[in-house]
Every structure is written in structure tokens, then in C-alpha cells.
């Protein structure tokens, strides 16, 4: 009977030693500051202080915490307008002073107001996805006035260190495909001359033509794409001349272009604002001579 009672008491002792702490307040145990926290590294001689009144300045906090140790630095976080956000950081000269404050955090009241005191933790992200380090709801992402980002969650401040991310692999340069590449080139105006195909006439017929002068350099219509159909001259049965018709077929709406220069273009037709029309052909009437004999 004594052996069984001793065995039961031994099992009960082991179970109690393996059971978790009933009141886990912070991911960093207060009595063991050297243990690695879940979200970063503890700053041994620095504490986080929340619940600071907006009227409280850094000198007031320095005087208050100097009662518990040698204060090295006091920093209250302000917004861009210079208004206090209600929390800050106290840095002590030694680690023992900071741990003394953490152990008495539940008893500290400043101006009849309870302060939210916890360890200051520097957050580290080395090759770990950001999503895996996101704390639960109620987390505030903050930045000190000097530009250091940190996270405030459950009364604990987590400092952010610069991320060390892997350099993305350099992709091999792709070769240019053999498919045709269209490169838009500027099109310049070219002096346009009206050309009239020579008409074929029968012998003995007279023909007058209006001399054609080069077109003016005024802005003209740039037709793209266009096509000019040339038809040969036809000879009328009555012995006259029929001028060759000049037809212009447009397949798109012309758009104005006013640049000057000379540029060779393929599959493009340049026409002036007035399309050249063939000169009229005049045929003289035969002269009738009366014979007096």
C-alpha cells in the first residue's frame, strides 16, 4: 500500500511540473529574459510603457521611473502632428533595473492611472514569410518619431528590424522573336506633282492642255492606305481623244498631316487638297470652204 501511494504521489508531481503556467501574460517569461520570444528578440534594458496620459511628457516619465533605477533614455511616440500616441519606451542603464520594473508592473500607477508595462521586443524577419508573423487581431503597427517601426500587441512592443530577404533570381534575357515588328516612323510631306497621262489622238487633230504647276506646300491630306487605279486611254470612234480617267479609291478616313521633309513611303499615296484632274481636250470644228466655181 505504501508503494502504491508513493507511485501516485510521484505521478502527480510530474504532471504538475509539466502543466503550463495558469496565467501566461506575455510570450516572454518575466523571470527568464534570456529565453527567445515568439515574435522577436527581447531588448534586455528597455521596457514598453502604455496608457500614458496625453499631458505627460518625457521629463515626467523620467522622474517617475528614476525611483526604480537609472534611466538612460525616455521616448514617447508622437504622431506627425506632434501629439502623443499614449505610449513610449524607457531604457535603463542595466538589465536588472528593467527586470525590476517588469516584476512590479502590476503595482505601478502614475497619477492614479495604471500603466501598461511590458518587455520591449525587437521583431526579426529573416527569410520568413510576412504572413506567418502577423499577430492576432487587436495589433497596432506603429512607428517611432525616428522612423523605427514596431508592433504593439497584448501589452508587448515588438521592434521591427530591417528585413533580410532573398534576392530574386535573375531571369535569362529572352531573345527577340522572329515575328515581324512594326515600327512607326514619321511621315514627311513630299512635293506633289500632278501627272497627266498622255492622250492618244488621231493624226490631224489639235489638242490643248493646261500646263500643270507643282502643288503648293500647303498642308495636304495623308491617305493611308490608299490605292490609285490607272486606266489606259481610249480612242473615241468619232476621231476625238478621250483623256485617261484618274480614279482614287480611299479605304480609310484621311487625317491631316502638316510636317515638311522628304520621306520614301511604301504602299502609301500622297495627294494634295485639290486632286489633279485631267485637262480638258478641245477639238476644233472643221472649216467649211465654199467654192465659187
UniProtKB/Swiss-Prot annotation:
UniProt entry keywords in alphabetical sequence: Cytoplasm, Developmental protein, Differentiation, Phosphoprotein, RNA-binding, Spermatogenesis, Translation regulation
BP GO annotations: cell differentiation; meiotic cell cycle; positive regulation of translational initiation; spermatogenesis
CDD domains: RRM_BOULE
Gene3D superfamilies in the cross-refs: 3.30.70.330
This protein's record includes keyword Cytoplasm: yes
Biological role stated in the UniProt entry: Probable RNA-binding protein, which may be required during spermatogenesis. May act by binding to the 3'-UTR of mRNAs and regulating their translation.
Protein family membership: Belongs to the RRM DAZ family.
Name of the protein described by the UniProt record: Protein boule-like
Gene symbol of the encoding locus: Boll
